[in-house]
């Protein structure tokens, strides 16, 4: 990949180099949203973000996963993208759900690498669960109890919005896809939140027609 700036424009970097970040000491875990969008604003085709990506995007995703302690994902995204166990040994995927209506025989949960994140009043589940909040998942409490330094978030829109509304997001790792969504668009972030919060561009790189950008919270 070729860096575009604002630091070291024109230099070459691979996905692992781009994903390697110095993070300042932080009392709470670092929460980083990873998402993809197109020139016409689509974030999904027929409910899935996978078709918008390609080999460069997949390698970048794997690089971000290699540098996190846990993956956090909404139940709808996990179902739509048919999540399986992560390829990295020891990495676990925490699925956020209020209803616990999940396929616990799926490869993700059968592998023992899937965790359910839900409310204290949700039904019992046959796998490991982390619970906080009554009626609504208390994401701040959940993230604090995961024992993770870096939480890598893979959507969907409702989870992204909830994390932003709770002021829990430290960085956004955004892929710009060269594909167009047309009528099959989706929102990267669903519901309104305080738009006064600002993120600053700290790095960007290009691989083919894909552009990767990292924004960090301005505090």
Where are these regions (language model features)?
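Enzymes that bind and transform nitrogen-containing heteroaromatic metabolites
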Residues: 1-219
């Amino acid at each position: 990949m070729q860096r575009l700036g604002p630091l070291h424009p024109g230099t070459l970097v691979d996905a692992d180099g781009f994903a390697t970040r110095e993070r300042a000491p932080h009392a709470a875990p670092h929460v980083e949203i990873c998402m993809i969008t197109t020139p016409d604003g689509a974030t999904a085709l027929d409910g899935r973000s996978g078709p918008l990506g390609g080999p460069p995007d997949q390698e970048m995703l794997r690089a971000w996963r290699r540098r996190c302690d846990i993956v956090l994902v909404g139940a709808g995204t996990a179902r739509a993208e048919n999540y399986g166990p992560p390829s990295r040994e020891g990495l676990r995927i925490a699925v956020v759900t209020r209803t616990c209506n999940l396929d616990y025989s799926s490869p993700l949960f059968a592998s023992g690498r899937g965790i359910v994140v839900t409310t204290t009043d949700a039904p019992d589940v046959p796998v490991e669960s982390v619970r906080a909040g009554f009626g609504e998942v208390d994401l701040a409490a959940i993230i604090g109890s995961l024992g993770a330094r870096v939480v890598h978030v893979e959507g969907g829109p409702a989870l992204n919005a909830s994390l932003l509304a709770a002021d829990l997001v430290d960085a956004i790792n955004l892929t710009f896809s060269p594909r167009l969504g047309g009528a099959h668009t989706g929102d990267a972030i669903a519901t309104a939140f305080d738009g006064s919060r600002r993120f600053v561009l700290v790095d960007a790189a290009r691989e083919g027609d894909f552009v990767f950008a990292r924004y960090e919270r301005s505090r």
